[in-house]
Curated annotation (Swiss-Prot):
UniProt GO MF annotations: lipoyl(octanoyl) transferase activity
EC class name: transferase
Further comment found in the protein's record: In the reaction, the free carboxyl group of octanoic acid is attached via an amide linkage to the epsilon-amino group of a specific lysine residue of lipoyl domains of lipoate-dependent enzymes.
CDD domains, sorted: LipB
EC number: 2.3.1.181
Species per Swiss-Prot/TrEMBL record: Streptomyces coelicolor (strain ATCC BAA-471 / A3(2) / M145)
Primary gene name: lipB
Family statement: Belongs to the LipB family.
Protein name: Octanoyltransferase
Domain BPL/LPL catalytic: 35-254
Pathway info: Protein modification; protein lipoylation via endogenous pathway; protein N(6)-(lipoyl)lysine from octanoyl-[acyl-carrier-protein]: step 1/2
Record NCBIfam families: PRK14345.1
Amino acid sequence: MSELRFVRMGFGADRVEYQEAWDEQRRVHAARFVDEVPDTVLLLEHPPVYTAGRRTEDSERPLDGTPVIDVDRGGKITWHGPGQLVGYPIQKLPRPVDVVAHVRRLEEALIRTCAEFGLETSRVEGRSGVWVLGDPVEQRPVLGGLSLDFDPRLSDDEFDPRLNGPEYAPSNAGQRREDRKIAAIGIRVAKGVTMHGFALNVNPDNKWFDKIIPCGIRDAGVASLANELGRDVTIEEVLPVAERHLRDVLENAELKPRVIEKTPA
């Protein structure tokens, strides 16, 4: 794969308004499609903003009328703001694009980033993003001598069966306390080129998540590097580490088109 270009758009006092970043994404996307620029990762921090993906339900929006920007990515509603490292990888991939493989690569880079700071994270079966797993529950609920197996896959609209395999922790069917998402991922692919990307919680004020159901997932919490490690962690610390792991994972990936299974005649 060709070398990645990283663009640091703005952090801290120079945070980038969401609309400005979205416009820049579309500009770079168009340039990448015609090979005017190489694969590019925009890295930045936003002022506080809620964005809603295409599948967001009205019931998942803030109840107090807080403004929300509707965007053309997958997924549901989320928050971006101070203390969150946001990355928008704009890459040309072989068609038909294997979106799941792209998501897995972003997850891998973020898992490695968290590990470098001493935090173990994981994927969770059926759910995108990077997670801090809840502590094991010693005993599952028992009713009338029968062990109850609450399997969220039976009723969870957000469960994606494509997100599975040995690199995923089993979906939480009550065997763990609440899992906590530390990095959200939402992707759009147009003309074989990716847009949108990830948001890694470094040291945000988590009260912003209280107004919404983050990513439409009701049975999970929100994590950050600072809270999980019990110390202050800054974006300035995390930025070069995340860049390095993104470069390593994305530049060294063996890119393949999505395999389309043929239906028997």
